[in-house]
């Protein structure tokens, strides 16, 4: 109780338990062909799978923050993802060039300032943050499970991913239909163990 004097911990518990249904998903800043292709070919289709994006949209006040370079829009056209799709799914697209700090190294300032921007948005809205990378592949129910496990609890969580060899992507394609990657936890873990980094 020494960390939260004057019943502040109790206030946080009640706030989370009773009111807070805000989630900001932070896609770690990405640019370049490899990571941008990976976002469109893997992360985005896995976000569309069962009990991920659709479920969390129905049950929470969610925003998905992307921090990308200006070439992102060329890839968006290539993959035929409309602005309407991004808007309907509450994607907020931020261009990395807006986060350059002339007093720092360009690359590190883009990354650091994107994190700071996201943190400020979470604090302002009292929103939980879920961090994902452009090269992640999420199993079905991933976002639902994270939201249900953490909802109503006044503490942080962490999640880890297995690093895998890129040859796993050939097998992942078997799970991709209608621009969705539908794979359950067990199958994804088994595949990751077959293709260690």
Residue positions per predicted region:
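Conserved catalytic core of nucleotide-sugar-dependent glycosyltransferases
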Residues: 102-111, 115, 119-120, 136-197
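Long, contiguous juxta-domain segments that are non-catalytic but functionally important
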Residues: 1-22, 39
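Short beta-strand-to-loop acidic/aromatic patch adjacent to the donor-nucleotide binding site
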Residues: 124-139
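Short, well-formed alpha-helical segments that are part of the catalytic scaffolds
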Residues: 34-55
């Amino acid at each position: 109780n020494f960390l939260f004097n004057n019943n502040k911990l109790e206030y946080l518990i009640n706030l989370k338990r009773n009111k807070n249904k805000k989630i900001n998903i932070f896609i770690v800043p990405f640019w370049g062909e490899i990571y941008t292709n990976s976002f469109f070919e893997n992360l985005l289709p896995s976000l569309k799978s069962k009990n991920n994006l659709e479920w969390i949209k129905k049950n929470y006040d969610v925003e998905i923050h992307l921090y990308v370079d200006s070439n992102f829009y060329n890839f968006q056209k290539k993959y035929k993802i409309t602005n309407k799709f991004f808007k309907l799914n509450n994607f907020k697209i931020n261009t990395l060039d807006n986060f350059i700090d002339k007093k720092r190294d360009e690359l590190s300032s883009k990354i650091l300032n994107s994190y700071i921007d996201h943190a400020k948005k979470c604090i302002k809205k009292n929103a939980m943050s879920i961090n994902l990378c452009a090269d992640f592949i999420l199993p079905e129910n991933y976002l639902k499970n994270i939201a249900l496990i953490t909802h109503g609890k006044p503490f942080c969580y962490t999640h880890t991913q297995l690093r895998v060899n890129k040859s796993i992507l050939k097998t992942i394609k078997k799970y991709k239909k209608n621009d969705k990657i539908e794979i359950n936890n067990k199958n994804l873990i088994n595949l990751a163990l077959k293709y260690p980094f």
